[in-house]
Amino acid sequence: MSANNSPPSAQKSVLPTAIPAVLPAASPCSSPKTGLSARLSNGSFSAPSLTNSRGSVHTVSFLLQIGLTRESVTIEAQELSLSAVKDLVCSIVYQKFPECGFFGMYDKILLFRHDMNSENILQLITSADEIHEGDLVEVVLSALATVEDFQIRPHTLYVHSYKAPTFCDYCGEMLWGLVRQGLKCEGCGLNYHKRCAFKIPNNCSGVRKRRLSNVSLPGPGLSVPRPLQPEYVALPSEESHVHQEPSKRIPSWSGRPIWMEKMVMCRVKVPHTFAVHSYTRPTICQYCKRLLKGLFRQGMQCKDCKFNCHKRCASKVPRDCLGEVTFNGEPSSLGTDTDIPMDIDNNDINSDSSRGLDDTEEPSPPEDKMFFLDPSDLDVERDEEAVKTISPSTSNNIPLMRVVQSIKHTKRKSSTMVKEGWMVHYTSRDNLRKRHYWRLDSKCLTLFQNESGSKYYKEIPLSEILRISSPRDFTNISQGSNPHCFEIITDTMVYFVGENNGDSSHNPVLAATGVGLDVAQSWEKAIRQALMPVTPQASVCTSPGQGKDHKDLSTSISVSNCQIQENVDISTVYQIFADEVLGSGQFGIVYGGKHRKTGRDVAIKVIDKMRFPTKQESQLRNEVAILQNLHHPGIVNLECMFETPERVFVVMEKLHGDMLEMILSSEKSRLPERITKFMVTQILVALRNLHFKNIVHCDLKPENVLLASAEPFPQVKLCDFGFARIIGEKSFRRSVVGTPAYLAPEVLRSKGYNRSLDMWSVGVIIYVSLSGTFPFNEDEDINDQIQNAAFMYPPNPWREISGEAIDLINNLLQVKMRKRYSVDKSLSHPWLQDYQTWLDLREFETRIGERYITHESDDARWEIHAYTHNLVYPKHFIMAPNPDDMEEDP
């Protein structure tokens, strides 16, 4: 039958076809009516049903014989049709034998019914009425199937985020980017660039989908829809849903069109014409799948098809060059490399790590919902070194997101209950021993009236517990009572916990009532661990006889006023909430905490010294050393530092959230210009203080701009100085620092950098705040992108943003450092020299009672401006002098 005679309701398929066992000779010359024996799996022959049960039953059950595989299927009687049966056959083959699929299988299979009473046992089915209950239906491949059909097996490609360095299986180049770097085939697992999607051959092996042929499908009526027509290509849409199962997602990309595939297959294959080639991007040999190492002349490239390989592999490559394939009149093979300098450690990328480490499917990002376009309407990207055309109305940039660095931003599993059980106690105020059902979680110890009710006698926050000690005070014990087992000491009361009955053996009956030394010791151990959850359990003192508690761990405490105290345990001063992860930096994880005596909320960065070599310990203390010398309202305040042999604890003030969270939670995932001006001015004022002291932050990004409150116009403070450097006004540094998405080109290229590095980051912050996307695409050179205004500032959303904002961004995102704006020049830019912004800042300074952003010398100028333009000039602003005047004069 013709390929164009498929039912209108069924989309044209590129499903895997009948397995090799379906027909012993699956070739165009095979007989269209050759079937295998109708023997059942139990050895007996099937007998056709003499009556059709559709009149009395709502479903029809029959057997499908596909080669040596037999499946029992059930179809609703009212839905039984020849088209439905063929759909079901395609689905079974697609699931059990995906590597045997071919183009247009639906139109090239024949169905035969086994009739044992007929001389010709196999009877061709031309109508669904010929299928009866219990029949055996043989699936046979038609002679219309050609060799080309078997060789065309399109890939099923999905946008994928890779966690390890991965290379394109078409061009051999690395897949660049932070997320959604490329496309992965669900069938064979190969990886491709998005730009290579329309060039790759339709040769999917389907090895990842293969199901054992002797394993039945989950249900007899399972029906899997056939793939979409190969003439249509699915592209990402801006509106979509996430967290779809890989098997349920709609394929987002396809390979080259079928007509091109057939044209290529007709070409004569000739030997490759190899020439020595220098690669500017990390590339692998497409024969042995290993990295082409070296600075230049790393390997050989075919002049015609651009196949890349080692010199040693050139003689082993099959002679299958097809020349340069054109698509819509344009070259479809890989073009010349674009010059994007990037340093890659060859030791970190090998044949094992370059692929296979990223097979875990991640939830599809929101852009993966599909709509369909005819490929003739699509412009194929050129790989030549040129500026690519960008959509004039929308941005192709990566959406703004939280960038995670070396330490995974993971939250400790929050256990609602650490320990629970009956326990007895009395207090320093009441010597009557009471029995309650204790429940210990990560933040408090609650004494319930019973084990099932919600009423409780007392709640003891862990942050109020000053220390746990062995039994020392027996003055309050009742006469004739047994002594307690340990003491919980708070600022207002002492809890004497447990009852030591003198029996060292374990008594389950007494333990269930809260009496006994062993049950009390288990509670003491659990509470000690809850008080210091980030300390390894092996390091925590658990024996009641130990009086030093945690003091053997903590060796010193360094306070911001330079006082040093020996043997001070951080758990006696602060309570760390392990399930309250505020964020993670390069060197540690930040937890929420509370000062035990005052109840003040703090943020505690816990740095694991064991993660870093001894020679880097000085770098770990760099943040503390810098913060100790910084006292500015726009910079997070350091309270103190604790150090143990294993960890460093940096205690800082706790703020409400960060700027990135504010951006992402906004209505359009971007900020209005008014709020952006307000926050950027504060960032620049804090940077001015840093640069005046020759301190460069080196890792400025929205995650490191903290907000003091949830107000629409909040106070902002800079944090995370782990990368900060002391750099003089005319000095340069070369060490690699910071987060790549916000770093200036000179750092990424390992060139010398100075304090202007922070100004580039400010430009990126302004860009992402106003647009909600990163300014640069990972696949293109920054110079080319900056010069392409259509790429940098697409009408959506930049038509709504003032030209002054764009001008400031352009002056900050200058590749040449000497052309980049300084702090003072940025503060003087017309975009920030705005009367409304000045009013917002003055209102904020009046609210907090401190003037440190604006300067009193500007008051007269703005008063004249208000008078000239008939604007209201408030008189209630505070007039206190700027504190910066006393320590700097920039």
Curated annotation (Swiss-Prot):
Q: GO cellular-component terms in the record?
A: ciliary basal body; cytosol; nucleoplasm; plasma membrane
Q: Main EC class of this protein?
A: transferase
The entry's keywords: ATP-binding, Cytoplasm, Kinase, Magnesium, Membrane, Metal-binding, Nucleotide-binding, Phosphoprotein, Repeat, Serine/threonine-protein kinase, Transferase, Zinc, Zinc-finger
Annotated organism of origin: Homo sapiens (Human)
Phosphoserine modified-residue sites: 6, 27, 37, 41, 44, 213, 216, 364, 391, 395, 442, 539, 731, 735
Where Phosphotyrosine occurs, the residues are 426, 457, 742
Q: What is its EC number?
A: 2.7.11.13
From the UniProt record, report the name of the gene that encodes this protein. PRKD3
Q: Which cofactor does it need?
A: Mg(2+)
Q: Provide the effect of residue 293 to W.
A: Increased ability to bind DAG, no effect on phorbol-ester binding
What processes in GO biological process is this protein linked to? intracellular signal transduction; phospholipase C-activating G protein-coupled receptor signaling pathway; protein phosphorylation; sphingolipid biosynthetic process
Q: What does this protein do?
A: Converts transient diacylglycerol (DAG) signals into prolonged physiological effects, downstream of PKC. Involved in resistance to oxidative stress.
Q: Which residues form the active site?
A: 699
Record domain Protein kinase: where:
576-832
User: What protein family is recorded?
Assistant: Belongs to the protein kinase superfamily. CAMK Ser/Thr protein kinase family. PKD subfamily.
Q: Where are the zinc fingers (Phorbol-ester/DAG-type)?
A: 154-204, 271-321
What the record says about activity regulation is: Activated by DAG and phorbol esters. Phorbol-ester/DAG-type domains 1 and 2 bind both DAG and phorbol ester with high affinity and mediate translocation to the cell membrane. Autophosphorylation of Ser-735 and phosphorylation of Ser-731 by PKC relieves auto-inhibition by the PH domain.
Protein name per the record: Serine/threonine-protein kinase D3
Domain named PH: which ranges? 416-532
